[in-house]
UniProtKB/Swiss-Prot annotation:
Pfam families for the chain: MFS_1 (PF07690)
Disruption phenotype: Does not affect the production of the naphthoquinones derived pigments.
PANTHER family: MAJOR FACILITATOR SUPERFAMILY, MAJOR FACILITATOR SUPERFAMILY (MFS) PROFILE DOMAIN-CONTAINING PROTEIN-RELATED
UniProt-recorded name of the protein: MFS-type transporter pgmG
Organism: Aspergillus terreus
MF GO annotations: transmembrane transporter activity
Gene3D superfamilies, alphabetized: MFS general substrate transporter like domains
Keyword NAD assigned: no
Family: Belongs to the major facilitator superfamily. TCR/Tet family.
Lineage, opening ranks: Eukaryota, Fungi, Dikarya, Ascomycota, Pezizomycotina
UniProt biased composition (Basic and acidic residues): 21-31
Keywords linked to the UniProt accession: Glycoprotein, Membrane, Transmembrane, Transmembrane helix, Transport
Ranges that cross the membrane: 45-65, 84-104, 111-131, 141-161, 174-194, 201-221, 242-262, 275-295, 313-333, 346-366, 378-398, 409-429, 440-460, 515-535
InterPro entries documented for this protein: MFS (IPR011701), MFS_dom (IPR020846), MFS_trans_sf (IPR036259)
Length: 560
């Protein structure tokens, strides 16, 4: 029955009931996490810029493929494999996120982060040099694997190299670098797509970053060992290998189902249903394996089940997934709207994102600075959720004739709302977690962000394709389904050019209506954020209390 003892009970046992050596190792680990920042001045400036820049690359790689897909199709002539370009990256990110956070809690953060950067760069090099689309897909998967570890590593390095008071500010800065990469992705991709060097340099450009950043990581980034005094053999033996395999299998089949359903295969096809069934079965087996600690221990499970017993972490998880829905959907569909309705190029459509992303980034930075200063976090979720709801509803009302100025205004409202709490959960979770749980807590929130964004985009894309296809075929009944889907995906623009002006306007109205329908997802996410914010405590998390407790917070649910 000892395996059912809670973490709190374990911590309250007398020393005689626990290994003295284990207690000493945990104390050392906690001291490592709580230590003051050891690097300052110009060295710290160079290190933090290098770390945050890797987030730019990660976010750039998320959006850069969208605008070079037509050129990739023309190179390899395999339209049926087009969805794999995004699915491979997303599958690798989602499936390995929790695993990376667990590894970061065992191994040296500096060297593990460096390994992930190299992995990401190797994947990018594979994509750039790919002789076949299968190699390109493999490179995307490898880049996603390294990118997931890189992102968890950034959050871990920021948490262990900053004080608790300044941590929200630096985590807020990840929003700035994420925004820069998100905006640059379509612009850089579109620029290379129409240039003489070609789309392959959209991936090769990442290698220049590695040439500059890796020496900085090697010689200036402080080393951080989360488990000093523990042999690497013991650390590796404590990883949950069975849970890792089950989770990867469940995530891969699940992401494939929601991304391929309605696009490559009908939702009721055997292929789609099989993926859902396999994913469901594997998730059930994974849950049982984690609950009963089969092939692992309670402390070493892949998924941080201990957070499921803490209401605060459950709320933070759902809040993070909800806000990911709020800002990921418009980031992908705003450029699409302008490409269809204003005949924008890929570069121009990417620039149209600036009002949205700039205000998301500004709100993220403001959140990091003010939350560090005043300590309260609940108002950010409540006010941010309200503004996100207003902005999402306004985006839902967009018609073919809606002015560009109005659309920019809607985007600004949505950007401010989403940015107010987009990254806040990382700092809040790290503040609420025990020091040695910080890497796992970081991965827990990162998993929510990736899962929310992945599921939202998959559903939004399916809704758009189905609604747009049905609307276009109602206007042009003679067009084949394959021709319509090819035109919607961007693989062929000749379809729209052959239409009469009146018919083209009706088709664009159908496309605009289909795009407006995807904003039901951000509306739902924002409404969920408001509902959950009401149940969040009115507490100060980042300001030291008079009693000198570690967090300086009141218990969950306290209203003072």
């Amino acid at each position: 029955m000892s395996e059912t003892v809670t973490q709190t009970e374990t911590d309250q046992r007398p020393a005689t009931a626990r290994s003295l050596g284990a207690e000493e190792k945990e104390a050392k680990s906690d001291e490592q996490f709580q230590q003051e920042r050891t690097i300052k001045g110009f060295r710290w400036f160079i290190v933090i810029i290098s770390i945050l820049s890797s987030v730019t690359l990660y976010s750039l790689d998320n959006t850069i493929v969208a605008d070079i897909q037509p050129q990739i199709i023309n190179t390899f002539d395999e339209l049926d494999k087009l969805p794999w370009l995004s699915v491979a990256f997303l599958v690798a990110c989602v499936a390995t996120n929790s695993i990376w956070s667990k590894i970061y809690s065992q191994l040296n953060a500096k060297w593990l982060y460096l390994f992930c950067v190299v992995l990401f760069e190797v994947g990018s090099a594979m994509c750039g040099a790919a002789p076949t689309i299968n190699t390109l897909i493999g490179g995307r998967a490898l880049a996603g694997l390294g990118g997931a570890g890189l992102y968890v590593g950034v959050m871990t390095l920021l948490s262990v190299n900053t004080t608790k008071r300044e941590r929200p500010m630096y985590i807020g800065m990840t929003g700035l670098t994420w925004g820069v990469g998100t905006v640059l992705g379509p612009i850089v991709g579109g620029g290379f797509a129409v240039s003489k060097v070609g789309w392959r340099w959209s991936f090769y450009i990442n290698l220049f970053f590695a040439a500059v950043a890796i020496p900085i990581y090697l010689f200036m980034l402080p080393s951080f060992d989360p488990r000093p005094g523990v042999s690497y053999k013991e650390r590796l033996a404590q990883l949950d290998y069975l849970g890792t395999i089950l989770m990867i299998g469940a995530c891969v089949s699940g992401v494939m189902a929601i991304n391929f359903g309605g696009q490559i295969y009908p939702w009721d096809s055997g292929q789609t249903i099989s993926c859902f069934v396999v994913s469901g079965v594997l998730f059930i087996v994974f849950g049982l394996q984690q609950w009963y600690c089969i092939g692992t221990t309670k402390e070493n499970r892949t998924f941080p089940c201990q957070f499921l017993a803490r209401p605060a972490f459950i709320i933070l998880f759902v809040q993070t997934a909800s806000v990911a829905t709020v800002f990921f959907v418009p980031i992908y569909f705003v450029p699409l709207f302008f490409q269809f309705t204003r005949n924008d190029s890929a570069i121009d459509a990417g620039v149209r994102l600036l009002p949205l992303v700039c205000f998301i980034v500004a709100a993220m930075i403001l959140n990091g600075a003010l939350m560090s200063k005043f300590g309260y976090y609940m108002p950010w979720y409540l006010v941010g959720g309200c503004l996100s709801l207003v902005g999402s509803v306004l985006m839902y009302t967009i018609k073919l004739g809606t002015s560009t100025a109005n659309i920019y205004g809607y985007m600004i409202i949505l950007g401010v709302g989403g940015g107010m709490y987009a990254q806040a959960s990382f700092a809040v979770a790290q503040g609420k977690a025990r020091p040695r749980e910080i890497p796992v807590a970081t991965g827990f929130i990162s998993l929510a962000q990736l899962t929310g964004g992945t599921i939202a985009l998959a559903i939004a894309n399916s809704v758009f394709l189905e609604k747009a296809s049905a609307g276009i075929m109602a206007v042009v009944p003679d067009a084949s389904k394959e021709t319509v889907q090819s035109a919607i995906s961007g693989a062929s623009s000749s379809f729209f050019q052959t239409l009469d002006p009146d018919v083209r306007e009706a088709v664009l109205a159908a496309v605009t209506h289909a795009i407006s329908q995807v904003y039901i997802l951000p509306i739902t996410g924002a409404a969920m954020s408001i509902s959950l914010a009401i149940f969040m405590p009115r507490e100060k998390l980042f300001v030291a209390s008079d009693t000198g407790d570690r967090d300086g917070v009141t218990p969950l649910g306290a209203m003072g």
